[in-house]
UniProtKB/Swiss-Prot annotation:
This is Endonuclease MutS2. It comes from the Bacteria. InterPro entries: DNA_mismatch_repair_MutS_C, DNA_mismatch_repair_MutS_core, DNA_mismatch_repair_MutS_sf, MSSS, MutS, MutS2, P-loop_NTPase, Smr_dom. Endonuclease that is involved in the suppression of homologous recombination and thus may have a key role in the control of bacterial genetic diversity. Acts as a ribosome collision sensor, splitting the ribosome into its 2 subunits. Detects stalled/collided 70S ribosomes which it binds and splits by an ATP-hydrolysis driven conformational change. Acts upstream of the ribosome quality control system (RQC), a ribosome-associated complex that mediates the extraction of incompletely synthesized nascent chains from stalled ribosomes and their subsequent degradation. Probably generates substrates for RQC. GO terms for molecular function: ATP binding; ATP hydrolysis activity; ATP-dependent DNA damage sensor activity; endonuclease activity; mismatched DNA binding; ribosomal large subunit binding; rRNA binding. Belongs to the DNA mismatch repair MutS family. MutS2 subfamily. It comes from Streptococcus pneumoniae (strain Hungary19A-6). One of its GO terms (biological process) is mismatch repair. Keywords: ATP-binding, DNA-binding, Endonuclease, Hydrolase, Nuclease, Nucleotide-binding, RNA-binding, rRNA-binding. SUPFAM superfamilies: DNA repair protein MutS, domain III, P-loop containing nucleoside triphosphate hydrolases, SMR domain-like.
């Protein structure tokens, strides 16, 4: 679409209205590049994206996106083979973090049906290893020690050397206090120095780095720390070299993924722009219009977005209607009406919401042309008429059936009769070519043209004769009329003069009376329509409230069911625990044999209600999923206190993690999720604890050393029964070697027990013949 119409309609100012709702530089750049299109599929896609985002906001009203900076230049530098600096890596790190947050948000999103937005969410990439690499850079722009082993080693040596320097200087401060002007360590040229009185400068050996302005103080680096300082300087150089090497290495690791990261950044910006459109809809009560396939326009309560307190109007541009001619005085908002129509079309064809009511419909035009305002050129010495006519001639040569044309004060600037004739001729040419046109004029001759000509409709702007002010209400189907006599009379002009004037144009009085009747009918119809709209709005509010209440009730119902299931499962667990305690008490007070106790326990289990299956419970699934680590999670390695990122899970259940440039293999207990740590720090959840009375937990080992034979055999009998009751597969019995009496007693007991599958001495490194390992039957 031609740029001139965008400038005429001030489209850039309209786009600026969306900027406060954007969170990313990528979204801002896409907004600035936004332009109208005539491709129906592109417009439909933009409309569908906004509607899906609206549905998303219903479920997630606080949906947001992390702010990101533009990285196109950074990715281009990578592709050209350049190495990045820390600031550039932090920009990439932010994009990867935002991408991961959006993926996580989408994975946990429920109760929303997405199609267009799903395409973008699923296009985002996952880079767990790169995220781990980039953990080497903290947000303050510092390379962490764990970025490489060499960097950690160098920094440890620097720290140790600096500590030595401090210790030496502190000792000298005490020893040479009388020789110093101040009891502090100063810094000159990056070196630690002592402020020595000039009279004692030869008493302290070292290097002079500075002298005070008065000459009374000499800043000396003592000889004892010179060597250490030189070592520190050398280590600092090594540190800089190692940091450069790390930057080069991580640049090489990121380089193959530069295009994918740039694509992710674009998607983040696109989602941000869609989000900003919906925030604009919420703020300004805008709507996503319907799209007409045949250039039919129906705008309900449409407003100009740049006019404060704009009056809302209806515009109907049916399929067969070719021209709307707005007649009447120059005041009243005719030009604003032209711009409102054009700007609304431009916004819709750019994929933006419009300021109108639901049910509004827009067409698709390949071009929109306009001749609005006085665009005469002083340099060309063109009159107002010549300027307008030059522009119109140019437009008439370019328009076709797929164009929308806006003409302001058509035929103005010349003789009224000739101007009116030219205006009618131009409108007739456009009508015959079936080009949709909205034109304004103050020539009364065009009223008759609008009434008598097919597919052309008159319109006007309402004027309140009581207040002598325009109301800016658009009256489609009603031609404009002059209010000169009413205004003159109200302003105090003699009724005789007004009457004489009206007699001179009796011929036009009939027309004015008809127009007046049409105005009254239009106003009455508008009042009825406004009442209908108020009822519709109330119904919509009621429907929204009922839907919200229904959803809340469903959520509460699901929550209560989940609580009930959990309580039922807890009751079952408590019942089984109590049954265990009962059986233990029975065993201690009776001569029941182990196998009889086991059979009794099995019967009790059959009597207990079936365990509640919570495997399909969404709430518990979501909580479990949230707690379980997954590829891409940020972690803290507990033994080192360093951050990293999980990159993969091994078959044995262990995890591989990237910690700076170091790859580590960790068990789940050796790390903590960063998110879990943050949750602990931010909020302490109140936990309801159910206290249960129970004995000690099952023991898998019995130590009989130092026991008498009878005491040992009684303990062995109780231990084996307890092990069987707790379904243990294997236990250890430590009897020692000694005289062998207890060992022999253990062997005989195990041989007699029918629940024992096998037993034998432990390996040499686990006690040898001083311990017996027992395996029970399944």
């Amino acid at each position: 679409m031609n740029k001139k119409i965008l400038e005429t309609l001030e489209f850039d100012k309209v786009k600026a209205l969306f900027e406060p709702h954007l969170l990313t530089e990528q979204g801002l750049e896409q907004l600035r590049q936004l332009a109208p299109t005539a491709k129906a599929d592109k417009i439909k896609q933009a409309f569908a994206e906004m509607k899906e985002m609206q549905a998303l906001f219903v479920e997630q009203p606080h949906f947001t996106i992390l702010s990101t900076k533009e990285i196109a230049g950074v990715c281009k530098r990578l592709e050209m083979g350049a190495d990045l600096n820390i600031e550039e890596f932090l920009l990439l790190k932010r994009v990867l973090l935002t991408s991961r947050e959006l993926q996580s948000f989408y994975a946990n999103l429920e109760n929303v049906s997405l199609e267009e937005l799903a395409f973008w969410f699923e296009k985002l990439h996952d880079f767990p290893q790169l995220q781990g690499n980039l953990q080497a850079f903290n947000d303050a722009g510092f390379i962490e020690n764990f970025a490489s082993e060499e960097l950690a080693r160098i920094r440890r040596k620097i720290h140790d050397s600096e500590s030595q320097v401090r210790d030496v200087l502190q000792d000298l401060l005490k020893q040479k206090a009388q020789m110093l002007t101040e009891g502090i360590v100063a810094s000159r040229n990056g070196r630690q120095v002592l402020p020595v009185k000039n009279t004692y400068r030869n008493k302290i050996a070292g290097v002079v780095h500075d002298i005070s302005a008065s000459g009374n103080t000499v800043y000396i680096e003592p000889r004892e720390v010179v060597k250490l300082s030189e070592e520190i300087a050398s280590l600092r150089a090594d540190e800089r070299y190692e940091m450069l090497r790390i930057l080069q290495e991580i640049s090489e690791r990121v380089r193959p993924h530069a295009a994918e990261i740039a694509n992710d950044a674009w998607i983040i910006g696109h989602l941000d722009l869609i989000r900003a459109k919906v925030r604009f809809i919420q703020e300004r009560q805008a709507v996503v219009p319907q799209l007409s396939e045949n250039q039919e326009i129906q705008l309900l309560h449409v407003c100009h977005p740049l006019v404060k307190n704009a009056v809302a109007n209806d515009v109907y541009f049916g399929q067969d209607l070719t021209a709307i001619v707005i007649t009447g005085p120059n005041t009243g908002g005719k030009t604003i009406m032209l711009k409102t129509l054009g700007l609304t079309q431009v916004m819709a064809q750019s994929g933006l919401p419009i300021l109108a009511d639901k049910g509004s419909r827009v067409g698709i035009f390949e071009e929109i042309f306009a001749d609005i305002g006085d665009e005469q050129s002083i340099e060309q010495s063109l009159s107002t008429f010549s300027s307008h006519m030059t522009n119109i001639v140019d437009i008439l040569g370019k328009v076709n059936q797929h164009s929308l044309l806006l003409l302001d004060e058509l035929g103005a600037g010349t003789d009224p009769q000739e101007g009116a004739a030219l205006a009618m001729a131009i409108l007739e040419d456009l009508r015959l070519r079936q080009i949709k046109t909205m034109a304004t004029t103050h020539y009364p001759e065009l009223k008759a043209y609008g009434i008598e000509t097919a597919f052309v409709q008159n319109a006007s702007m309402e004027f309140d004769t009581a207040t002598l002010r325009p109301t800016y209400r658009f009256m489609q189907g009603v031609p404009g009329r002059s209010n000169a006599f009413e205004i003159a009379k109200r302003l105090g002009l003699s009724e005789v003069i007004v009457g004489d004037a009206s007699q001179q144009i009796d011929q036009d009085n009939d027309v004015n009376r008809i127009i007046e009747q049409l105005e009254e009918q239009t106003l009455e119809s508008r009042k009825r329509l406004d009442n209908i709209r108020e009822v519709e709005q109330e119904n919509l509010k009621m429907n929204r409230a009922l839907k919200k209440l229904y959803n809340e009730l469903n959520r509460e119902k699901e929550t209560e069911l989940n609580k009930a299931r959990e309580q039922a499962a807890e009751i079952v667990d408590m019942a089984l625990s109590e049954s265990d305690q009962i059986l233990k008490n029975l065993h201690s007070k009776s001569q029941l044999k182990p196998h009889e106790i086991i059979e009794a326990k099995a019967k009790l289990k059959k009597l207990a209600p079936e365990k509640v299956d919570l495997s399909k419970n969404k709430v518990l699934q979501k909580a479990k999923k949230k707690r379980a680590p997954k590829v891409g999670d940020d972690i803290v390695v507990l033994s080192y206190g360093q951050r990293g990122t999980l990159t993969s899970q091994l078959k044995d259940g262990r995890w591989e993690a990237q910690v700076g440039l170091i790859k580590m293999t960790l068990e789940e207990k050796e790390f903590d999720l960063v998110q879990a740590q943050q949750e602990k720090a931010v909020k302490k959840k109140q936990v309801n604890v159910v206290k249960r009375t129970s004995g000690r937990g099952p023991q898998a080992r019995l130590d009989l050393r130092g026991k008498r034979y009878e005491e040992a055999m009684n303990e062995l009998d109780t231990f084996i029964d307890q092990a069987l009751l707790n379904n243990m597969a294997q236990v250890d019995i430590i009897h020692g070697i000694g005289t062998g009496v207890i060992r022999e007693g253990v062997t005989k007991y195990l041989q007699r027990n029918k629940h024992v599958k096998s037993f034998g001495y432990a390996p040499q490194n686990a006690g040898g013949s001083g311990a017996t390992i027992v395996t029970f039957k399944g």
